[in-house]
From Swiss-Prot:
All residue ranges annotated as the Radical SAM core domain in the record: 170-407
Protein name: Ribosomal protein uS12 methylthiotransferase RimO
Family designation: Belongs to the methylthiotransferase family. RimO subfamily.
Compartments reported by the entry: Cytoplasm
InterPro entries listed in its UniProt record: Elp3/MiaA/NifB-like_rSAM (IPR006638), Methylthiotransferase (IPR005839), Methylthiotransferase_CS (IPR020612), Methylthiotransferase_N (IPR013848), Methylthiotransferase_N_sf (IPR038135), NA-bd_OB-fold (IPR012340), Ribosomal_uS12_MeSTrfase_RimO (IPR005840), rSAM (IPR007197)
Polar residues bias: start-end ranges: 15-25
A GO BP annotation: tRNA modification
EC number per UniProt: 2.8.4.4
Organism: Saccharophagus degradans (strain 2-40 / ATCC 43961 / DSM 17024)
Xref: NCBIfam families: 30S ribosomal protein S12 methylthiotransferase RimO (TIGR01125), MiaB/RimO family radical SAM methylthiotransferase (TIGR00089)
GO molecular function: 4 iron, 4 sulfur cluster binding; aspartic acid methylthiotransferase activity; metal ion binding; protein methylthiotransferase activity
Length: 479
């Protein structure tokens, strides 16, 4: 389990492993030195990067209001648990985390994706003594609950107890997630995100770019743009014109990327649907203004399965679009996620997916066996796939993609690539190229890192590869 420890003297947390579940709130607990009883908050953050950003915002407000965020249940006057409710296993993990916090501390405020609808009722019935239950992005409600149980310090002076301009971050200093919108307009049958987070609500473009600017000024080298549907950014406000640095900027994906490309950091796009207007962003990648990297949730390739999922079912056109993008930007890296064993998926449907995968030649791929989610419309579909068939198809899928990945990485051997360093152990460093997002993609492990620092870039000669990762040697600076 990973514990993120917040040090107020730094702009971001230091990550270390914890071997004591009873000592530290899990699984992503945030800790800070504390000097005063009666004003201490424990924090447990679960779920995806979008939930992580929610946690960062709550933690920032806690610090602004003068609270200390502490590393142990025993030291906390109250514990906030930010839950995940995307799939049933995540819900169980959230319930377990709430249960542990109740057992170890007893004073618990619950928020996040499980804090809405039927799931909220389950929490209240399972743990009737929780102090408060609120849904995702309910920042004011969470702070109100904290204030109600532990009033802020009367003597707190925000001019003395400084919070970094970029706020509290749970990621290492050199990269950060930038959430550009909340909610989703899609109604996929396997997903309950719209039920939890509502329809798409885009953040004002000035707020998005202002946050990015503060992050870069604080030392962030890589910005990971996230949302439920990045390519739909601004559609809810009809691409309204906002302002940044005194100039007009449309609330739209293209203009956002153009502006982010001016900041001098790596800009990585996640959760991009392959709409036609994404074509306009590819030239920015070819020109080096943003990273030539797209994370696209294809989910499947069979027209029938996609129809059952209520997803776009024109994979032939998608292949044409991918070919067009690669022609415009040969360095383009594509990552995606897929679901196998969706209700009604036949062997023929699965073979269509494997054939499509071979033709698409994606660089990075994740795959999940379909898992029922309470409240999802897919639960009512006929012909659910047996667990053993889902597992067998998952293994065949991963074997197919593993071969594609290995072949693509082998082609990089002998080339020199820029690597951003994530960790260093003596002379050995681990980092990522532009082709790899943190935590979900591959890494580059290279020697010759003595004297280097985490967050720096290093030119690395690639000397080896396996199915997912690269190895290399740092290229000495000739100057």
């Amino acid at each position: 389990m990973t514990v993120n420890t917040f040090d107020p003297s730094k702009a971001s947390p230091v990550t270390h492993a914890s071997d004591s579940a009873s000592k530290t709130p899990e699984p992503n607990a945030v800790a800070a030195p504390s000097s005063e009883l009666g004003n201490r908050v424990g924090f447990v953050s679960l779920g995806c990067p979008k939930a992580l950003v929610d946690s960062e915002r709550i933690l920032t407000q806690l610090k602004l209001d003068g609270y200390d965020v502490v590393p142990s249940y025993n030291d906390a006057d109250v514990v906030v648990v930010n839950t995940c409710g995307f799939i049933d296993s995540a819900k169980q993990e959230s319930l377990d985390a709430i249960g542990e916090a109740m057992k170890e501390n007893g004073k618990v405020i619950v928020t996040g994706c499980m804090g809405k609808g039927n799931d909220a009722q389950v929490i209240k019935e399972t743990y009737p003594n929780v102090l408060s239950v609120t849904g995702p992005a309910a920042y004011e409600e969470v702070m109100g609950a904290v204030h109600g149980y532990i009033p802020p310090k009367k003597e707190h002076n925000p001019l003395i107890d400084l919070v970094p301009p970029q706020g509290v971050k749970l990621t290492p200093r050199h990269y950060a997630y930038l959430k550009i919108s909340e909610g989703c307009n899609h109604r996929c049958t396997f997903c309950i995100i719209p039920d939890m987070r509502g329809d798409l609500v885009s953040r004002p473009i000035g707020d998005v770019l202002g946050e990015a600017e503060r992050l870069v000024a604080a030392g962030t080298k890589e910005i990971l743009v996230i949302s439920q549907d990045t390519s739909a950014y601004g559609v809810d406000v009809k691409y309204r014109t906002g302002f940044w640095q005194g100039r007009p900027v449309k609330t739209r994906m293209l203009e956002m990327c153009e502006a982010l490309g001016e900041l001098g950091a790596w800009v990585r796009l996640h959760y991009v649907y392959p709409y036609p207007h994404v074509d306009n962003v590819i030239p920015l990648m070819a020109e080096g203004k943003i990273l030539p990297y797209l994370d696209i949730p294809f989910q499947h390739a069979s027209p029938q399965v996609l129809k059952n999922m209520r997803r776009p079912a024109h994979q032939e056109k998608t292949l044409e679009r991918l070919a067009k993008w690669r022609e415009m930007c040969p360095e383009l890296v594509l990552r995606s996620t897929f679901v196998v064993g969706f209700p009604g998926e036949t062997e023929q449907d699965f073979q269509i997916l494997l054939d499509w995968l071979q033709e698409a030649q994606l660089d990075r791929v994740g795959c999940f066996e379909y898992s029922p989610v309470e409240g999802a419309k897919a639960n009512a579909l006929p012909n659910h796939v047996p667990d053993e068939v889902k597992r067998e198809r998952w293994e065949r899928f991963m074997e197919t993609q593993q071969a594609i990945s290995a072949a693509k990485l082998k082609q990089k051997v002998g080339y020199e690539m820029d690597v951003i360093i994530d960790s260093i152990d003596g002379d050995i460093a681990t980092g990522r190229t532009y082709a790899d997002a943190p935590e979900i993609d591959g890494v580059v492990t290279f020697s010759g890192a003595a004297g280097m620092k985490v967050g720096e870039f290093s030119a690395v000669e690639i000397t080896g590869s396996d199915d997912y990762d690269l190895t290399g040697i740092a290229v000495e600076d000739e100057q």
